[in-house]
UniProtKB/Swiss-Prot annotation:
Other remarks on this protein: The porphobilinogen subunits are added to the dipyrromethane group.
Swiss-Prot/TrEMBL cofactor(s): dipyrromethane
EC class of the enzyme, as a word: transferase
A Gene Ontology cellular-component term: cytoplasm
Pathway(s) served: Porphyrin-containing compound metabolism; protoporphyrin-IX biosynthesis; coproporphyrinogen-III from 5-aminolevulinate: step 2/4
E.C. code: 2.5.1.61
Cofactor stoichiometry and binding remark: Binds 1 dipyrromethane group covalently.
Record field: catalytic activity: 4 porphobilinogen + H2O = hydroxymethylbilane + 4 NH4(+)
MF term (GO), any: hydroxymethylbilane synthase activity
Name of the protein: Porphobilinogen deaminase
Family note: Belongs to the HMBS family.
Species the sequence originates in: Acinetobacter baylyi (strain ATCC 33305 / BD413 / ADP1)
An example Gene Ontology biological process: protoporphyrinogen IX biosynthetic process
Length: 311
């Protein structure tokens, strides 16, 4: 530990305001633990940041937001990468480890509008902005009359498009708005019954080289075991379904003492079909529960829904 404290820890991050907030948050937590630690943020513009005129589902999904950061870890330009867990692909490059999952912020989706308080108050045919097929599916299940329009860009860009009148409402992650001090923009948090969160939503993950014991030891105190169990269950569910980050799959786990409850949904993009199920079990069985739930939804026809999407 002493040797790393005498060096500079390099954290890879995207340049968006939210990504920088997340990296700075981890930097501050580490420096509170290790006051002698020097930290440098190494900033990258990823492919996901560059390609803003095409829906994510058509250009490779949210993995485009992490590839450059992972390359920097592998070639030694960075020691640590901070990710929003909902952006992290199910399979990591060889040699890297998702070593720490930090305590979760609000996992729910947020309804944001300048005119109305909720979906119920939106007029027929109102325009709702989101880049998420998961949100689109669940919104259309409730309100098939709404026009769901793709919405890309960082949080500030998305809010500016709403303020310009391009949308009647937009849906964003509550966690991002809260982290950026924009809680006043949230009209209300959307109940999970209406919009079940994305796998990993609201949690931060720390990725590093799998064999770098100094870094692994350094970041270990930031791990939050209850969040880790929940996110591991969610990711196992998604991985078994072979779902990327841009498919109409929702997975959300909660923990009460040692009992883990995992809810999952798979739907069609048009919202006409939405399969739901849940499992419960001991937190030690997080991944097993994720696979069990995936199998239950596959038995309901989830595989056919996802195959239709990939074709």
């Amino acid at each position: 530990m002493i040797s790393i404290l005498m060096q500079t820890l390099k954290i890879a991050t995207r340049q968006s305001p939210l990504a920088l907030w997340q990296a700075e948050h981890i930097r501050d937590r580490l420096q509170a633990l290790y006051p002698e630690l020097k930290v440098e943020l190494v900033k990258f513009v990823t492919q996901g940041d560059k390609i803003l005129d095409t829906p994510l589902a058509k250009i490779g999904g949210k993995g485009l937001f992490v590839k450059e950061l992972e390359a920097a870890l592998l070639d030694g330009r960075a020691d640590l990468a901070v990710h929003s867990m909902k952006d992290v692909p199910m399979h990591l490059p060889e040699g890297l480890s998702l070593a720490v999952i930090c305590e979760r912020e609000d996992p729910l989706d947020a309804f944001v509008s300048n005119h109305v308080m909720s979906f119920d108050q939106l007029p027929l045919g109102a325009r709702v902005g989101t880049s998420s097929l998961r949100r689109k599916c669940q919104i259309l299940k409730q309100r098939p009359d709404l026009e769901i329009i793709d919405l890309r860009g960082n949080v500030g860009t998305r809010l500016a498009k709403l303020d310009d009148g391009q949308y009647d409402a937009i849906v964003l992650a509550s966690a991002g708005l809260k982290r950026l001090g924009l809680i006043s923009r949230i009209r209300h948090s959307i109940n999970a019954e209406i919009s079940l969160p994305a796998v990993g939503q609201g949690a931060l993950g720390l990725e590093c080289r799998a064999n770098d014991k100094k870094i692994l030891d350094l970041i270990a105190p930031l791990a939050h075991q209850p969040t880790s169990a929940c996110v591991r269950a969610e990711r196992a569910f998604n991985a078994y379904l072979e779902g990327g980050c841009q498919v109409p799959i929702a997975g959300f786990a909660t923990l009460t003492q040692e009992c883990l409850t995992l809810e999952g949904r798979v739907g069609s993009v048009d919202g006409k079909t939405l399969l739901k199920d849940h499992v419960e079990g001991h937190a030690d069985q997080a991944e097993v529960l994720g696979v069990q739930l995936a199998k239950q939804l596959l038995a309901q026809g989830a595989g056919e829904l996802l195959r239709d999407l990939y074709q």
